[in-house]
């Protein structure tokens, strides 16, 4: 008997079947390194971005926003250290000639055996041929930067890099933002945008791709207050995920050992989600790094520009330390889907039960907020239902569905996470009211049309 699909596999199947995510270039075979977000996926992604922006940028008096360029001057990446040290340890299987990140092979070994490989690659089996052990090329560095060329000739004079993080645009604009926004430390700059990394082994659905989106903050503080702010941003980040429905038992904090910190980091703690990948149970959702004064100082040195701050109250000048909460947008999307996914038995019209697939998404994240479902395609019901859907659509995403049995339509809405379904029936023609069904409890309530919009706004946390 075939093994039942894992929860993660079920979510991936649902995501592709219902239009959350499609393989990019699917008609040409697709690629593991990039995915397209379909009608439901783009709505979910936009809702996550909106909640993040409202929580961390627009909703705080000590934050401002920025949208910096994807292609920055090459000098930026030379100064930041990325050209020199932004690389991964690459090894190649002598059996299959597939390439792997050596650190990922070591992590998988440790997860299985409870300790790191004593002899390095000599202890590692080929993933496709477990009986073959130690058949690897020597480890060598592999640049994670994606190159492109600007101008009419593809030579070194036109060499540029696609940004591997959004942070550097914030650092290079620091002085301009400081002057024009009239902010002073402690304050932060938030940004949402695409980044690109030449991953050796993209995979695990949308978790590790070469093109992805980040939601990043660079928070500038007075030296000596950085550890306190570091702890604050860890707590705020944790609360953001749990406040939007992530179960606390499915996330954890992971502190990077000193010897594995990034070249810019004084301290880093990741928040990881229990995706239960094959060979690696946990995956990074976001990280908070104490970048100290590394970035501003290195750009001062290489650009010759003053990126310090003068504190008039203390009559002293200093280079701010930076606390960086960096969220992976598409990883967050994947975690919200996995955490919300559920299969349960629900009563059917015949007195028995059927399997119900449901996404218990927070209403603020749900790609469709309300479904309008006329009981039938009756010529009297349809105009009322369509008019209601058009009116509700002015404030929120609405799905109109008049195809099939009402129970089947409820199930279709449940599996994409629609919080509320509004049924227009023949009584609606007489009493000017509709039946509102709750996704999670399946309870139904009769609501007058006159107060429906206010009722929905309260239930959907729009007010």
Curated annotation (Swiss-Prot):
Write down what this protein is called: Glycine--tRNA ligase
Q: Which InterPro entries match?
A: aa-tRNA-synt_IIb, aa-tRNA-synth_II, aa-tRNA-synth_II/BPL/LPL, Anticodon-bd, Anticodon-bd_dom_sf, Gly-tRNA_synthase/POLG2, Gly_tRNA_ligase_bac, GlyRS-like_core
Quote the function comment for this protein: Catalyzes the attachment of glycine to tRNA(Gly).
- Gene3D superfamilies for the chain: Anticodon-binding domain (3.40.50.800), Bira Bifunctional Protein, Domain 2 (3.30.930.10)
Which organism was this protein described from? Leifsonia xyli subsp. xyli (strain CTCB07)
Chief place of localization: cytoplasm
EC annotation from Swiss-Prot or TrEMBL: 6.1.1.14
In the record, biological process GO terms are: glycyl-tRNA aminoacylation
Q: Record's SUPFAM superfamilies? A: Class II aaRS ABD-related (SSF52954), Class II aaRS and biotin synthetases (SSF55681)
The protein's UniProt keywords, in alphabetical order, are: Aminoacyl-tRNA synthetase, ATP-binding, Cytoplasm, Ligase, Nucleotide-binding, Protein biosynthesis
Which is one Pfam family of this protein? HGTP_anticodon
Kindly list the positions annotated as binding substrate: 101, 165, 212-216, 324-328
Its GO CC terms?
cytoplasm
Q: Where are the transmembrane segments?
A: none
